[in-house]
């Protein structure tokens, strides 16, 4: 759920109704659902902290006992002056306090600076709550071995990681996907036991969209090259998990 970009802040009740509808459908289907406070152009999560507190208070009151509901409280903090200790940590602490009153044990994902790349800033500065995870994002055509080493170092130093967004293209989204580099990333994540979510379940004219633009039904014919790739990776993981 975008905060700006014509999102929640511009039509709170309508957008919240759509979020609730989506969550309810996921619960019926016995799926995990991540409620994503998707900041982007607003850069610093503190700009709309009060609105985030109100939103997550409302939503966690409804779904506080649903263990398949995950709260992601600030997608991709960004901007040179938006750092973990000075900006994201104090924001997260205030929002988590509200969620924990309604949902003591739910998983909460917290974004990290530089569009969820600077996860090393979390080392030694984790939030004082249980079931907190820290977001890391990448795009296979842009972020390679150096980023995997950074992520591995964070894990080795006790940072619980959730890759809540990754794409098969470049960070600029481009027109091509990078299967070989994506293979390296997926193998790395699976070997480390890191959960991941692919961007994105949409039919936008972007390389990372899994659906073709004129899609009306969900079948392989309507999946993009990226969609077919991601479906294959999910199926491979399921086969491994269910052995």
Model-predicted segments: where are they?
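Localized chelating/binding microdomains
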Residues: 2-4, 42, 69, 78
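Active-site-adjacent substrate/metal-binding segments within catalytic domains
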Residues: 1-28
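Short glycine/proline-centered loop/turn elements that form peptide/ligand docking sites
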Residues: 39
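Extracellular glycoside hydrolase catalytic/binding regions
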Residues: 32, 49-70, 74-204, 208-240
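Extracellular carbohydrate-recognition regions
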Residues: 243
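Short acidic-hydrophobic catalytic motif
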Residues: 45
């Amino acid at each position: 759920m975008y905060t700006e970009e014509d999102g929640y802040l511009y039509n709170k009740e309508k957008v919240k109704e759509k979020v609730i509808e989506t969550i309810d459908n996921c619960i019926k289907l016995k799926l995990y659902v991540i409620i994503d406070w998707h900041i982007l152009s607003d850069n610093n999560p503190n700009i709309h902290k009060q609105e985030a507190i109100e939103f997550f208070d409302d939503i966690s009151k409804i779904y506080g006992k649903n263990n398949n509901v995950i709260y992601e409280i600030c997608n991709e903090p960004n901007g040179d002056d938006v750092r973990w200790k000075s900006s994201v940590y104090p924001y997260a602490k205030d929002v988590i306090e509200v969620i924990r009153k309604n949902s003591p044990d739910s998983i909460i994902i917290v974004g990290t600076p530089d569009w969820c790349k600077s996860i090393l800033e979390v080392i030694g500065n984790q939030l004082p709550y249980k079931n907190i995870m820290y977001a890391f994002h990448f795009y296979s055509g842009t972020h390679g071995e150096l980023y995997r080493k950074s992520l591995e170092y964070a894990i080795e130093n006790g940072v619980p990681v959730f890759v809540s967004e990754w794409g098969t293209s470049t960070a600029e989204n481009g027109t091509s996907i990078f299967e070989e580099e994506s293979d390296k990333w997926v193998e790395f994540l699976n070997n480390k036991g890191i959960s991941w979510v692919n961007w994105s379940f949409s039919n936008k004219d972007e390389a990372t969209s899994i659906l073709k633009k004129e899609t009306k039904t969900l079948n392989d014919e309507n999946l993009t090259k990226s969609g077919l790739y991601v479906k294959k990776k999910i199926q491979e993981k399921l086969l491994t998990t269910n052995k």
